[in-house]
Amino acid sequence: ADDGATRQTKWGPLSAADRELIKKVRLATLWEMTIAQEAMQRGSSRRVREISREIAEQHHALDEQARDLAERLDVRLPVRPTADQQKWMADISGRSGRDYDRTYVKWLRLAHGQIFAFIGQVRGSTQNTLVRKFAEACNAAVLNHQRLLESTGLAGPEAFPDPPEV
């Protein structure tokens, strides 16, 4: 179990937040890569099928990076999606046609919106050079995925997390 302490590595200090980013990205890839691959086949619109290919490919690359980083930094990774992520997958997979597309975009856009701010916080605070580079790759991918999902025209209000408190 992670004790929350900052650990020293040859790439700089590794904080609990740094480790959490690696774990969160792994969790995201476990369900988003799978469901994007499904949407490449089951999406009812050509646009959903197109964006799903790009999302799946980028999640595959992020997953490889997360697993490599975890090995180098001795971070234990999850092996299955969370209960919520499994519910989202079941909700998407249980639908068809345009309803499938809308539900797919809703859950993926919501998940990307939730992790986006955390990636920025870690990038802004990490002193670990490996995590910094990883956070930059994650930031670029998540921003791109949000744009792709929004480009479908199916991202309604329920696809966005609550705004931050000020």
Range-by-range predicted roles:
Residues 1-166:
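His/Met- and acidic-residue-enriched segments that coordinate or traffic transition-metal cofactors
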